[in-house]
């Protein structure tokens, strides 16, 4: 058996109030690079993961720069690599941007106008960008000549609809200006974030309350959006050897004429069953999980799916809902190139393909109750439930009964990736932002829409960039964008203001300063977050440990799950389990579940298990519980809206210590430990 923590970054420790991280060794970075690459079949045994034009390119050479992560991909919504120019060598680029646009779209345009050409990704061509849009009418979006329409997510709050799609970068401004398009947002990166699980959640049939008969979740669909599905593990097979998986959508697979949303490859139950009869099922199907590596003992998705719905046929230990039907979406890393140096620091996926994955699962489920597990997240965003991604999540579950989305709270407690404070009237305030090893980073700050903050970025050597006034942006570099600062006034989704800063690798190691100057006569409160980086996390020198939930974990209608250690008598909170509330003060997470040292199915085995920790392991335990609740309700002829389901989960939760039925909320435990 192997073991792996869901937090694959070095553990931070406090030194003088700051968070310190040990940089990865060269050997570990090489191992990550090799493990992270989705290689052609002639190299890794993987089949059907690359377009045919790439399959002939068998020899891939990793330079030292690639291994060290100093040569990240040049993609539309990322800053370029600075080639160790240093801060003083940067100058303002003569490119004009529309300051009303989403900052990521502004960056895409700045990159395009400075001559950078993006890579093609799983669902976009070169110089296209994935977007989430708020539109007046579906017809206008679907028939627009510049749009490759994706998924319809549902009705938006107030008016219109939420949709996804792909558009050319050079048409972004024109589309954003059209009256039928109310808002346009670029894709945002997201990352992956049993014995004790069954016992602590009360999912053992012997302990069910009288009259509760979920029949193992029979008749309910559990969908998992993650990476890596070991469909040949016996925990996902019936007694007759057939698969419990109704389908797999591999978003990175070679597209066919019937590909969902126009990309990737769908594998049906019949195709999976045929592959299971072969000596090498993964080769026969043309899909399989990544091989094990010194740093990853088993794929994330296989482990997550087993916790929610494995039947124990192979391992001897069933998950929470062993009779449920399973659907898996292997999400594509759409914010990175699928070859070359980008593999060193690849993202898990993106928010557009995430929403399309959930839409696909609900469509496949049809009239059956369905819960979708998302053990992933991101730090950027308003953290108030207003982002188009979160509105999309809400729309997907509000339209029908018996639909739920469960999201891991995140593992950011103690990382130093959140801070907050107040800039006094007409005063200034400095935020320390430490960059280890010249790795760069991404910073996002939100404050009230009736206030105005000017921002200046100061490098460790004292070089100043800015100031940037509200409603303007500043691209800096040497022909290409190396630093990008954007200040948005009146965000369309919530009316608040936002400041975004992107710093490329190799600019300068050390403590950067973000200087805020209040342009109003009233004190201005703010919250700021740093985007997650699993290899060398930048951090605030004076972090605030509240409000560390992942940004999609602040959705209004998703069920958000924290983690505790189910092996210890005191059931302590998992060390890294993120902390609520949301920026607008709502109480999340809803519940917590076992997430530390959880044993479940191991990749590339038919019956093995491995140990992992994190809120990624807690979320599927709750997904399995929801499947049981849905199955019992269906047996009694009842439907559950998402609000009724949330109330039922909170009502059944175990308080620790017991509060006599009082619904006391804890910023990390939620309303209690999830239980039948």
How would you name each of these model-derived features?
Residues 2-213, 218-221, 240-241, 335, ...:
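Autoinhibitory N-terminal propeptides
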Residues 116-121, 340, 365, 369-375, ...:
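C-terminal subdomain of the subtilisin-like protease fold in secreted/lumenal serine endopeptidases
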Residues 187, 331, 356-384, 408-409, ...:
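Short acidic, glycine-rich surface-loop motifs adjacent to enzyme active sites
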Residues 209-350, 367-370, 381, 385, ...:
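Subtilisin-like serine protease catalytic core
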Residues 249-250, 260-277, 402, 415-508, ...:
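Extracellular S/T/G-rich loop segment that most often corresponds to the catalytic His/Ser-adjacent loop
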Residues 305-308, 314, 327-335, 362-370, ...:
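Hydrolase catalytic cores
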Residues 371, 389-420, 424, 673-675:
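Catalytic cores of secreted or luminal carbohydrate-active enzymes
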Residues 521-533:
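Edge beta-strands of jelly-roll/beta-sandwich modules across compartments, strongly enriched
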